[in-house]
Amino acid sequence: MLIFKICFYRLLPLSVLLLAACSALKAPESSSVLKNHIASDEWQEYQHQLKQIQQFQIQGSVAYFSDEKKAYARFFWQQYSPKNYHLLLLSPLGQTEFELKVTNGRVDMAKYKDQGEIKGDAEEILFKLTGIPIPLEHLSRWIVGASSDADEIILNRQSRLKTLIHHKKEQTWKVYYQAYNTKITPILPERLELYLISPNHQDQRMTLKINHWILK
């Protein structure tokens, strides 16, 4: 596995960069939403290219905002197959704060600092440790710009995703694609904003900045 020399900032509440409450969050409004979109040939071809991406490595940064708190971190993600991946979070000194390995959709190993292995669902484990509801089940497809699990989509002028909306139980995820990396083939997302809208009105937002892509 390629090892990146990265400094990672701890996620909330890993005792680093806990800031004051931020202002109320509002997702950008869209003028039109495409349901059951009958896509152009260009869009269909692009999605076909994305489906071929089964393995990748990315490194980048994440910023998290809610009504009460905000946090910043850097991450490393290695995707081996659709249901197999490895996630690392490290301290500024390069020490492993959190490590997660998922095999066939199940947690194979989860470690937090020196507390040993942790059992449970991947999303539940990460939420308990960080307080951030990261949608790991869908994130690997959203990261590459695939719309396979979308309920509603909006395309940009280049026939790539501009907005993706996914409904899960009483929650709604809205993903806004703000920038793409045009130096790689196929062109892949470089900056995303994810909004979680839930009935308790505790709206939450994450910004993902992908600094480096490796495709296999």
Curated annotation (Swiss-Prot):
Lipid-carrying residues in chain (S-diacylglycerol cysteine): C22
Key words, A-Z: Cell outer membrane, Chaperone, Lipoprotein, Membrane, Palmitate, Protein transport, Signal, Transport
Record-linked InterPro entries: LolA/LolB/LppX, OM_lipoprot_LolB
Lipidation residue positions, type N-palmitoyl cysteine: C22
Disulphide bridges: none
Leader sequence residues: 1-21
GO biological process: lipoprotein localization to outer membrane; protein transport
Superkingdom of the source species: Bacteria
Pfam families: LolB
GO cellular component entries: cell outer membrane
Compartments (UniProt record): Cell outer membrane
Bilayer topology term: Lipid-anchor
Main localization (coarse): membrane
Gene3D superfamilies in UniProt: Lipoprotein localisation LolA/LolB/LppX (2.50.20.10)
NCBIfam families documented for this protein: lolB
Purpose of the protein: Plays a critical role in the incorporation of lipoproteins in the outer membrane after they are released by the LolA protein.
Family: Belongs to the LolB family.
Quaternary structure and partners: Monomer.
Protein name per the record: Outer-membrane lipoprotein LolB
Record organism: Hamiltonella defensa subsp. Acyrthosiphon pisum (strain 5AT)
Gene that specifies this protein: lolB
